[in-house]
Amino acid sequence: ARYFLVELTGGVSMTGCAIVYGCGKMGVISLRGAVFFIYLGILFVIALVDWHIQMIYDRFHIMILILAVLDFMLYPEMGIATRLTGMGIISVPMLVLALAIPGAFGGGDIKLMSVSGLLIGGASMICAMCIGIITGGAYVTLMLVRKRLNKTDQFAFGPFLAFGLATAIFLGDKMAVWYLQFGAV
């Protein structure tokens, strides 16, 4: 089942990146699409590793940082201010919570959101975190109801953050605009 999931995720990721970020010459995915396809692959590995051992290795953060620098060179239209906002808008509050409430968030989760913010920007980061909290909260609620977790147990939040980040690279800006328009009504 895992092999099928990996193959399906890879195919959907490549197709999504080609649709959203376009194809280059001769039908090959654009460079920006390739950056996000690689990012999705890293997120997938992070989700699997964190799920099993509750750890996000720094090598993954470094890879995402490299992708963020490359994307900045390929797509300077998303300015440095937007990227720096993305870097701090979620990770700084997570860090404050982790310092105030020991165990609230792991360092790997905080670093993941920081380097991802450099890549996808502030609006998408807010959407990513909302999706991560909703899906993670639904999972924990289900596990508490089934008595597979108790209130003091820790769980891997990385897979839910990764899902939120993956969703945000396709829909983050659209979701932010929708939310702002919804609030204006």
Q: What positions do the PLM features span?
A:
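A membrane-topology feature that recognizes alpha-helical transmembrane segments
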Residues: A1-V185
